[in-house]
Amino acid sequence: MENAHTKSPAECLSYFGVNEHTGLSPDQFKKNLDKFGYNELPAEEGKSIWDLIVEQFEDLLVRILLLAACISFVLAWFEEGEETITAFVEPFVILLILIANAIVGVWQERNAEDAIEALKEYEPEMGKVYRSDRKSVQRIKAREIVPGDIVEVSVGDKVPADIRIVSIKSTTLRVDQSILTGESVSVIKHTESVPDPRAVNQDKKNMLFSGTNIAAGKAIGVAIATGVSTEIGKIRDQMAATEQEKTPLQAKLDEFGEQLSKVISLICVAVWAINIGHFNDPVHGGSWIRGAVYYFKIAVALAVAAIPEGLPAVITTCLALGTRRMAKKNAIVRSLPSVETLGCTSVICSDKTGTLTTNQMCVTKMFIVKSVDGDHVDLNAFDISGSKYTPEGEVSHGGSKTNCSAYDGLVELATICALCNDSSLDYNESKKIYEKVGEATETALCCLVEKMNVFNSNVKNLSRIERANACCTVIKQLMKKNFTLEFSRDRKSMSVYCTPAKGDGGAKMFVKGAPEGVIDRCAYVRVGTTRVPLTSAIKEKIMAVIRDWGTGRDTLRCLALATRDTPLKVEEMNLEDSTKFADYETDMTFVGCVGMLDPPRKEVTGSIELCRDAGIRVIMITGDNKGTAIAICRRIGIFKEDEDVSNKAYTGREFDDLPSQDQAEAVRRACCFARVEPSHKSKIVEFLQGNDDITAMTGDGVNDAPALKKAEIGIAMGSGTAVAKSASEMVLADDNFSSIVAAVEEGRAIYNNMKQFIRYLISSNVGEVVCIFLTAALGLPEALIPVQLLWVNLVTDGLPATALGFNPPDLDIMGKPPRSPKEPLISGWLFFRYMAIGGYVGAATVGGAAWWFLYDSTGPAVTYYQLSHFMQCHNHNEDFTGVDCDIFEASPPMTMALSVLVTIEMCNALNSLSENQSLIRMPPWSNLWLMAAMTLSMSLHFMIIYVDPLPMIFKLTHLTFDQWLMVFKLSFPVILIDEVLKFFARNYIETGKEVK
């Protein structure tokens, strides 16, 4: 049924053809069940494990590696002699890497699908309905409730469907619908129709929503929507329809993979084509096919060399280390790539309640009447410190601390606050904090009484548990509460009927409620211990102060407190009929007024300042009304004190009324959205994404889940619902906005470090490609074989690359604007730099092998012509007289080449400590992890040269002292070359960037 909130109860009942007292007949139930289905949310149809595994292999780099592994595998079958075993090592290792990567990927994806499943925890098991086959109410499974069912709910129940209330069977009906609307206080419901067809859920005061909880009262209503048609069901559909966006890093790596794969394919084809003339060389036994296969193997080796196999593992490790550092700052990251996304966040959309504020109502101001002279009235106003539910804080008057017991008016005000109250404060020993028991507003009044301590009780030596309610207990011992006249919407107040615990003093009635309602029923004002008639002029003055407190910077929620000195006798009252309560609360004396608010967290203002410096816009999104929202924005620095906010703050309704183009413009400018629904949050994220903003969105309720899933970074609160947590990328353990800012800083540092190690690995791979390309182009014997390349890419390069993730962050990291997600990982200049470095790495590696052939004292001392035409070496060729042709497959030159490559890479790791800073400014010991990783890498390299049987597997042998000396001579210049390139970058190429 559409817009049931706009219809009267009778219209809703007739729409379903049902009677409030008898309910649906069995036939009607069967018909409606066939039409609407069971009242449950469908289980999420997750991807099968097989689909998820296949998805992991959709990455281009992974596919190329897979292809290389398959080809190596096929070629290994045709190997002869002792090489058979080593030939199988390479495809086996590649497959192992790919499997490990796929396992990590699948595990991550499985977690993401729990979000929609978690919604099911809000489905109640049972429901109470009236059906015509039974005389009384019957309990049935909630899934069997259909639209048209007459449902009964009472305190403690979870609402089983979306229900239009038909009649309320108690004084009031309060519902906690925070999971759905984010409202921090329970909402009072009624039965009258709400005429606005576009009302937001917060304003549908005659509706009960599936999954919310009844906080007080009892009611009967007609189910108007079940299953997926309920509000919570719509949220499920939104979540199921939200596609997970790729993070900027994933997009970058995809793009990078594509470029790399094109370059690799090109080089492989080129190397193969260059050597077509050599296919018939005698070394291949004169067989053209064997020659083609030999060069095909070299092309495959090239592919293996060009792909940084270690990259996925290093990135995962770096992100995992980042998540550990973030966890220490109370930000628990659920999806690894989002760690880096945080670094380019340009907008943070934050909930108000509990994130920017403490979600702990506190009284910050109060006043009593000081004196009355004719129509002139003087008030005594007091300020109260403290921003949490604790009994600690001071009452001050005119800036100095006050002794509350000196004011009779304050003693009476404290008495009303303590007695006209069903809540209390409790000390939770396991969490070591004070918590509310009951209503937020009433708990704030309990805290006020404790801070006032009007009877000067000795509270210093009490334990925390005793301290929680010490002062309230003293007051409750003096007066006995006989009964309570519950709050009702028509009079907007509640009262308690009390008699003195000792002696024979008369009964009193203490009242608290909305100022306009209470003051209208007051005939007097309290001045000291006497009472003075309340004239309209005095009333106007008091209301003016209350209006002032309710607007402006504070936007306090005000409560008036009053006493009826001579109430009716108990037997004269009808306590069953709540419509009469207003008549009993008349002829009252106004005592005072308290103003409370949900105060901002202390550290938020500083964090918002930090965001401003870092070029990040903070948008506050709240279900509260606009006045309160703007006031909090001013308090925490989102808006300046006197800033004009006419185009910077909107309610959900105002936003909806704008044409689409203006909505986009509004989102570009605004910093505050009030009275919003979940659908608005998703819309705001969409517009921000349209502006190329990277958005972090906070939320804690079920209602926030679709927006959390849609935003690049969904941030759930530690105290939030399971749905919100599983739909998000990050959970704030302490619900604190400042933790988001700390996480953004960490994200920026991680990206910078990631850039360094990606570049480090790439320049290493460029070196390997150049090495293979040079040997093929110059016709030299192969210097490195695939299994050696794999070892370098995975182990010797992987360790320093991982350690680069520990580089210290730049000092001004939060002084720069967020980087654009479109910024390339490797710019034109950097590409040149890494080609230059890679070119040297490749040339030096080939040089090391060639040096052994041409000049080493233990080598064969062949000529360069013989070396570059080694393919033509056979016994009958005069050019090779006296040369043993097997020497061209010896292991010392390979060992030389590999040692040069590994040592150069260690020097290159030092170059990567900083993008442009010289090693003189940023010495190696600024990252001790890197020093340790380099030591370990070199130790592992020595191991494969000197520890049997590894030299056999890797085709290596021992090196002499002179050979090691040559290795170092060839390796060290890479540091000098990069220092020159860094000097140019600092002084000529990237100077503009620094200044900005």
UniProtKB/Swiss-Prot annotation:
GO terms for cellular component: endoplasmic reticulum; endoplasmic reticulum membrane; endoplasmic reticulum-Golgi intermediate compartment; H zone; I band; membrane; perinuclear region of cytoplasm; sarcoplasmic reticulum. Gene3D superfamilies: Calcium-transporting ATPase, cytoplasmic domain N, Calcium-transporting ATPase, cytoplasmic transduction domain A, Calcium-transporting ATPase, transmembrane domain, HAD superfamily/HAD-like. Mg(2+) binds at residues 351, 353, 700. Keywords: ATP-binding, Calcium, Calcium transport, Disulfide bond, Endoplasmic reticulum, Ion transport, Magnesium, Membrane, Metal-binding, Nucleotide-binding, Phosphoprotein, Sarcoplasmic reticulum, Translocase, Transmembrane, Transmembrane helix, Transport. One of its GO terms (biological process) is calcium ion transport. The active site is at residue 351. It comes from the Eukaryota. Residues 785-805, 929-940 are annotated as: Interaction with PLN. Its main location: endoplasmic reticulum. It is an enzyme of class 7 (translocase). Ca(2+) 2 binds at residues 765, 768, 796-797, 905. It is a multi-pass membrane protein. Its EC number is 7.2.2.10. The chain crosses the membrane at residues 49-69, 90-110, 254-273, 296-313, 755-774, 785-805, 826-848, 895-914, 928-946, 962-982. Ca(2+) 1 binds at residues 304-305, 307, 309, 793, 797. ATP binds at residues 353, 442, 489, 512, 557, 622-624, 675, 681, 703. Key regulator of striated muscle performance by acting as the major Ca(2+) ATPase responsible for the reuptake of cytosolic Ca(2+) into the sarcoplasmic reticulum. Catalyzes the hydrolysis of ATP coupled with the translocation of calcium from the cytosol to the sarcoplasmic reticulum lumen. Contributes to calcium sequestration involved in muscular excitation/contraction. PANTHER family: CALCIUM-TRANSPORTING ATPASE. NCBIfam families: ATPase-IIA1_Ca, ATPase_P-type. Belongs to the cation transport ATPase (P-type) (TC 3.A.3) family. Type IIA subfamily. Interacts with sarcolipin (SLN). Interacts with phospholamban (PLN). Interacts with myoregulin (MRLN). Interacts with DWORF. This is Sarcoplasmic/endoplasmic reticulum calcium ATPase 1.
